[in-house]
From Swiss-Prot:
Binding of FAD, residues: 13-18
PANTHER family, alphabetized: GLUCOSE INHIBITED DIVISION PROTEIN A, PROTEIN MTO1 HOMOLOG, MITOCHONDRIAL
Co-factor(s): FAD
GO molecular function: flavin adenine dinucleotide binding
Name of the protein in its database record: tRNA uridine 5-carboxymethylaminomethyl modification enzyme MnmG
InterPro entries reported for this sequence: FAD/NAD-bd_sf, GIDA_C_N, MnmG, MnmG-rel, MnmG-rel_CS, MnmG_C, MnmG_C_subdom, MnmG_C_subdom_sf
Encoding gene, per UniProt annotation: mnmG
Family: Belongs to the MnmG family.
Length: 652
């Protein structure tokens, strides 16, 4: 056949997970096919027109550090940029951008169309082909068969998607797009563990019918930040403000009076929604004591009047939506361009995934994005990059990769999913990471770009820029450690201005930089400071953070070293935990269900106690001793009722 039908990797779906997956696989060198039901919607922002935020911005920076597209596309399409938590410590600072939907989508499509090794094709996928426990390809809705040893499914909300507006509902993948019914049915045939989740979106408003004069303006930051490590502020288009208004008691009364017409509160919707992005009816019900909730009016783009009212996601009937909107100050005459709605969809239990995001059930089948129970563009993009990369690595016969929890928020995300699963849509927060002081936005490249280069994800341009930055940080840090500030040479008035008090002894300049209010640029003005100071803001930022937080980071690294021992202790994949005597039935059942790969993963499964982990360590040591002695350890119990360990661990 002249038309290509055999590929190394096939990616199904062109959202944020699918586009990053396809780009990652192609960058590594795999012949990659991206299948989408509509090429015009590649990279589409289905819900809110924003990228980043607390925890989410960290993921975007990590995707960027690994050569992904999201941050760079946001720099080209972002119409407002802000640093959240700017007054707090660097660990929780996060970048957030409003994006022009059209510009963002164009930036993503440009990268897809110009990526070597990547083919785009417009066809919905109806079937997966498998042979035994291996995936072999896909079949489209018109019967076209494409073969590949690795398939990445990034179906978003399309699998058996059902949209609800009031008590009316209809099948759709999102508003205006068809659902993936046949593919959803095929996945059920494969007996993969699954469930239903739901998410929602607010009505869109016409800016020409809004009175912004009675609202609080929310401008972006000045100077304007960038998202990508390679980004420049000059790439940004025109910047626009957002606006803030509030619900009121009348708004709440309207909602309460119509809860019986809500599909959520009338029992029509079965899926669980996102806890941290609740609908307005959910807010009124859960926070009944609050008399007002913020609403952020976000522009959808530079060439449209459409406004996204962040904070009033709803599935109430349209007449109620209109009454709710017009009860809000500044929106008394607002015209709704698109109704809000809720959507239910199938997801698959991520505990059935390996850390590579390959399913445990079928070799070569990878899942990424909302299909794994997550919510958010950023979480999807990060999973997509990892799944696409591992699909390509597998085809090339290379080892799979996933960062550890202490290496990246991506590692935290994947580990949470595969060990704990989800009972509601999963959203990333900085609070989910144990080692967040080391997992900052600003050092994502220092943490991940070298690994990205090793995997084949990072191109020459990014690598050269990274090496220049890394080397500059190392050189300047070494100079500051070698240079001394002498009390006799530094006038007291200058010392008080820069470091807060006169010098009573000699200090290395790096020591002085550790002081809370000491800034690098001012420190370099003191007599004895190294000549030709650094000028790159990213280099200076890393030097200052390293100096001021070194003690905390060192302590955290000590904790990491202890945890690594558990993470590197492998558990047999075929271990029947019911044979490990001393474990409670509950723990045995949970370990047999989840089949953790390491002792560290086992300890993060809900209900598995520290005592159970200690007992498993005893079991592993006894097994190793038996193996060293040449004994058959296949039936080796962890405890046989004898010894102190057996007594202590009984009933764990």
């Amino acid at each position: 056949m002249l038309y290509p039908s055999r590929f190394d990797v096939i990616v199904v779906g062109g959202g944020h997970a699918g586009t990053e997956a396809a780009l990652a696989a192609a960058r590594i060198g795999a012949k990659t096919l991206l299948l989408t039901h509509n090429i015009e919607t590649l990279g589409q922002m289905s819900c809110n027109p924003s990228i980043g935020g607390i925890g989410k911005g960290h993921l975007v920076k990590e995707v960027d550090a690994l050569g992904g597209a999201m941050a760079a596309a946001t720099d080209e399409g972002g119409i407002q940029f802000r640093i959240l938590n700017a007054s707090k410590g660097p660990a929780v600072r996060a970048t957030r951008a409003q994006a022009d939907r059209v510009l963002y989508k164009a930036a993503i499509r440009h990268r897809l169309e110009n990526q070597p090794n990547l083919w785009l094709f417009q066809q919905a996928v109806d079937d997966l082909t498998v042979s035994g426990d291996r995936v072999t390809g896909v079949v489209t809705q018109i019967g076209l068969a494409f073969e590949a040893p690795a398939v990445v499914l990034t179906a978003g909300t399309f699998l058996n998607g059902l949209i609800h507006v009031g008590l009316d509902n209809y099948s759709a993948g999102r508003a205006g797009d068809p659902p993936a019914i046949s593919l959803g049915a095929r996945l059920k045939e494969l007996a993969l563990p699954q469930g239903r989740l739901k998410t929602g979106t607010p009505p869109r408003l016409d800016a020409r019918t809004i009175d912004f004069s009675v609202m609080q303006e929310q401008p972006g930051d000045d100077p304007v930040p960038v998202f990508s490590f390679l980004g420049r502020a000059s790439q940004h288009p025109q910047q626009l403000p957002c606006w803030i208004t509030h619900t009121n008691e009348r708004t709440h009364d309207i909602i309460r009076a119509n809860l019986d017409r809500s599909p959520m509160y009338s029992g029509v919707i079965e899926g669980v929604g996102p806890r941290y992005c609740p609908s307005i009816e959910d807010k009124i019900h859960r926070f009944a004591d609050k008399t007002s909730h913020n609403i952020f009016l976000e522009p959808e783009g530079l060439t449209t009047n459409e406004i996204y009212p962040n904070g009033i996601s709803t599935s109430l009937p349209f007449d109620v939506q209109l009454a709710v909107v017009r009860s809000i100050r500044g929106l008394e005459n607002a015209f709704i361009l698109r109704p809000g709605y809720a959507i239910e969809y199938d997801y698959f239990d991520p505990r059935n995934l390996k850390s590579s995001l390959e399913t445990k059930s079928f070799h070569g089948l990878f899942f990424a994005g909302q299909i794994n129970g997550t919510t958010g563009y950023e979480e999807a993009a990060a999973q997509g990059l990892l799944a696409g990369a591992n699909a390509a690595l597998q085809v090339a016969g290379r080892e799979a990769w996933c960062p550890r929890r202490d290496e990246a928020y991506l590692g935290v995300l994947v580990d949470d999913l595969i060990t704990r699963g989800v009972s509601e849509p999963y959203r990333m927060f900085t609070s989910r990471a144990e080692y967040r002081l080391s997992l900052r936005e600003d050092n994502a490249d220092l943490r991940l770009t070298e690994k990205g280069r090793e995997l084949g994800l990072v191109d020459d341009v990014r690598w050269a820029a990274f090496c220049e930055k890394r080397d500059a940080i190392e050189r300047e840090t070494a100079r500051l450690r070698a240079a001394w500030a002498h009390p006799a040479r530094v006038p007291a008035v200058d010392a008080e201005r820069v470091v807060g008090k006169a010098l009573e002894r000699e200090y290395r300049f790096f020591e002085l930089l550790r002081r809370p209010n000491t800034r690098y640029a001012e420190l370099m003005s003191l007599p004895g400071a190294p000549e030709n100071p650094a000028t790159d803001p990213q280099v200076i930022e890393q030097i200052e953070i390293a100096a001021k937080y070194q003690g905390y980071i060192d302590r955290q690294q000590g904790e990491v070293a202890k945890q690594l021992q558990a993470e590197s202790t492998l558990l047999p994949a075929d271990l029947d935990y019911s044979r490990v005597r001393g474990l409670s039935k509950e723990v045995q059942q949970k370990l047999n269900l989840h089949k953790p790969g390491t002792l560290g993963q086992a300890g993060r499964i809900q209900g598995v106690t520290p005592a159970a982990i200690s007992l498993l360590m005893v079991w592993l040591k006894r097994r190793d001793l038996a193996a060293a002695a040449g004994a058959d350890d296949t039936g080796l119990p962890a405890t046989d009722g004898e010894g102190e360990a057996a007594t202590r661990m009984r009933g764990v």
